[in-house]
Amino acid sequence: MDGSHYDILGIAVDAEPLEVRQAYRQRLLEAHPDKQGGVDKGAVTRIQQAYRVLSDPTQRSAYDGELAVQIAATGVHGRADALDEHSLDDFEYNEQQGVFTMACPRCSSAEGFELPEQALEENATARPGGGMQVIVQCAACSLWLKVDFDIVYTSE
């Protein structure tokens, strides 16, 4: 349950106050010790903090501004709608650096899209049909893409 307050509550950034409250209650029920077989105080604390911020218009506006700055700085985000989708298989992988790269389909910058493995781990969200997804911006232009991938575990 990592990510933004929106990710924690499982809501869209434009969610109405009623949706925020309903998601908060649902997440608390899901995190309840009787449902989880134990107490994860960290999860409950994150849910409560997300609700406190997103249910207060002033705090939410300030948080949205901070989130926008963070997204602009990293060029990677976990959620968005109406973007072109690509598979991580479309990217080239540099094993030494642990980075996936792809030329931008709009501006043709050779490594316009760069996804370090850590960015995938920290920013990915689950896709409704299974697998994971991350949103990334071209380093040379304003194009954003959804990048879909599956987590594959290998035994070493």
Swiss-Prot record:
The keyword Signal does not apply. One of its GO terms (molecular function) is ferrous iron binding. It is found in: Cytoplasm; Nucleus. Coiled coil: none annotated. Gene3D superfamilies: DnaJ domain, DPH Zinc finger. GO terms for biological process: protein histidyl modification to diphthamide. Residues 82-150 form the DPH-type MB domain. SMART domains: DnaJ. SUPFAM superfamilies: Chaperone J-domain, CSL zinc finger. Its main location: cytoplasm. Zn(2+) binds at C104, C107, C138, C141. One of its GO terms (cellular component) is nucleus. The keyword Metal-binding applies. It comes from the Eukaryota. Belongs to the DPH4 family. The DPH-type metal-binding (MB) domain can bind either zinc or iron ions. Required for the first step of diphthamide biosynthesis, the transfer of 3-amino-3-carboxypropyl from S-adenosyl-L-methionine to a histidine residue. Diphthamide is a post-translational modification of histidine which occurs in elongation factor 2. This is Diphthamide biosynthesis protein 4. It comes from Eremothecium gossypii (strain ATCC 10895 / CBS 109.51 / FGSC 9923 / NRRL Y-1056) (Yeast).
